[in-house]
Amino acid sequence: MSSSHLPSVDKLLRDPACQPLQQRYGRQALLATLRDLLDELREPARRGQLAALELSEAVLAGRAGERLATQHKSRVRRVFNLTGTVLHTNLGRALLPDEAIEAITLAARYPLNLEFDLATGKRGDRDDLIEELIRELTGAEAVTVVNNNAAAVLLALNSLGARKEGIISRGELIEIGGAFRIPDIMARAGVKLHEVGTTNRTHAKDYEAAINPRSGLLMRVHTSNYSVQGFTASVATAELARIAHAHDLPLLEDLGSGSLLDLSRWGLPKEPTVQEALRDGADIVTFSGDKLLGGPQAGLIVGSKALIQKIKKNPLKRALRVDKLTLAALEAVLNLYRDPDRLAERLTSLRLLSRPQAEIRTQAERIAPTLAAVLGESWQVAVTDALGMIGSGAQPVARLPSAALCIRPQQPKRLRGRSLRQVEEALRCLPIPVLGRIDDDALWLDLRQLDDEPAFLQQLAHLQEELAR
């Protein structure tokens, strides 16, 4: 068939099969897709490589529809996080509770008093929406919020220590994900790094000896994403605050994960809390909103009213501020902390972190037979004890007792790697991608975070199709 037998774009646009596509995707998108499709087919058609049926209006409309569906498919995809890492940075960290989701919906749909004082009828400050609540929960004098904790650290350093020295222990010069390094952030903030002590041991006398007329602040960083054990020494917040205040210097403490409550109450490892840092004398404390706090991505800066005011006057503050959706979600999450007795029931991240191993194992035993039937006799599916992680740099050596579906190919060890990669890829290609981890010649699906069991089971039928490709 020659290219002259290709239908014209106008003819395709008028074809009944294309009308639903035009309604759904718009005329311009359909037109561009049809032109691209016809351009690709013109040469094969000229050479007679295509049958008449392949060039029919119905077939071409179908191919255009497939392309348009792919083009318009959202890149933001829901996934099943069965990796065993609860606050997974690459998978969005904390899952928000229903109260926060409802607050976001209202804030997105309607105008709100973001920077408007309803009492006076004048312009307001967006921090006012959550300041009183955070002060109540932390005991801080004042509060400001930016878009993440890295921004909080940058803003605080630049506001309090620009063109001066920042004194910090060598053992706290951490790097977290995305090449965020404390020395680099200090340099960007205009603060000259003055490191003291050694990697494993730093003493109060090291800070004392480092203070000089060029000193701008003392900084303490909670090393939440790694642990130095053995012959170690560090200076507690209270002692460091005493040293700083004796020389009229502020103490900035970066808590990173930012817990507001003692997590050991729910059987989790204890993390230093914001309240403890402030009570021990830290003038400014920074922490994340989407890690242990269980809220949206945000960086919270709390502490001295005078220093917070100085931070808020920094022109960088506007560049780093949060939007209405973040503030709405953050307020809703923080409100849950007013009732700590019910927090594990209502705060999604805490509920998942504290989920009992026995409950997870029961769920795994319920699902295992179905998954085994889908995979067939060439695979072994076993319910196995597992050890998960909190994630997002919190308590790196702590493990969460859990249970997993351990998928192992029934073949010689030298052949297992390829088979495991195939099933891992097939799970990622499901309508709701399933993400696990490969370890010890098996694919592990840790079920700690499997909330929607019906949706997981419903799509297992597609797994056979993906494996057959």
Swiss-Prot record:
* Names of required cofactors: pyridoxal 5'-phosphate
N6-(pyridoxal phosphate)lysine: residues bearing it: 291
Q: Where mainly located?
A: cytoplasm
Fetch the Pfam families from UniProt.
Se-cys_synth_N (PF12390), SelA (PF03841)
Q: Name one GO biological process term.
A: selenocysteine incorporation
Q: Which GO terms describe its cellular component?
A: cytoplasm
Q: In which pathway does it act?
A: Aminoacyl-tRNA biosynthesis; selenocysteinyl-tRNA(Sec) biosynthesis; selenocysteinyl-tRNA(Sec) from L-seryl-tRNA(Sec) (bacterial route): step 1/1
Reaction(s) this enzyme catalyzes, per UniProt: L-seryl-tRNA(Sec) + selenophosphate + H(+) = L-selenocysteinyl-tRNA(Sec) + phosphate
Compartments annotated for it: namely: Cytoplasm
Keywords on record: Cytoplasm, Protein biosynthesis, Pyridoxal phosphate, Selenium, Transferase
User: What the protein does?
Assistant: Converts seryl-tRNA(Sec) to selenocysteinyl-tRNA(Sec) required for selenoprotein biosynthesis.
Report the Gene3D superfamilies cross-referenced here: 3.90.1150.180, Type I PLP-dependent aspartate aminotransferase-like (Major domain)
- Which gene does this sequence derive from? selA
UniProt-recorded name of the protein: L-seryl-tRNA(Sec) selenium transferase
Q: Which HAMAP family match?
A: SelA
Q: Which family, according to the similarity comment?
A: Belongs to the SelA family.
- Quick one: signal sequence residues? none
Q: Name one GO molecular function term.
A: L-seryl-tRNA(Sec) selenium transferase activity
Q: What class of enzyme is it?
A: transferase
